Amino acid sequence: SYTGESGGTPRYVASPDINTEDFCAAVDFLSTHDDVDPERIGIIGICGWGGMALNAATIDTRIKATVTSTMYDMSRVNANGYFDSMNADQRHELRRQLNEQRTIDTKNGSYALTGGVVDPLPDDVPWFVKDYHNYYKTDRGYHKRSLNSNGGWNKTSALSFINMPLRSEERRV
């Protein structure tokens, strides 16, 4: 709804609820076409949208096949940090900082962005950050309007993922 070539506002927002609904809305659209077999609708979630695809498949019984590719569990990383490194006190401090940022954003009338994928890349980053860089910051995946290639997501998007474990019901798919 608020990324890529969509026209939605506010821009640069990731939301487990809204982005899950985007998948379900696509199924709504497809299921109304005579040339689509409603019993053969599938979805694919790439990178951070893998968790949203699994969440959509958990709630929408019309989805008959679900694929995730290079899945990145945004809810887990936002709640627990990379490698589950964040404790309860650190998580509370993160929430405090992000809510302070909401106030700043409201006063400014615009969202502060996270900055996208780190560039230049430090030597000691985890392998998956190197993979992000190798994709989003090179000709292979760079795009001038890509969030990850450039300014990144709005900083406060992380709040909605902290208490939303997207993969908690995936066994129901």
Regions found by a protein language model. Give the residues of each.
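Alpha/beta-hydrolase fold nucleophile elbow
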Residues: 35-47
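Catalytic nucleophile-loop/oxyanion-hole region of alpha/beta-hydrolase
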Residues: 3-38
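Hydrophobic, aromatic-rich cap/lid helix
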Residues: 137-166
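Alpha/beta-hydrolase-fold enzymes
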Residues: 54-139
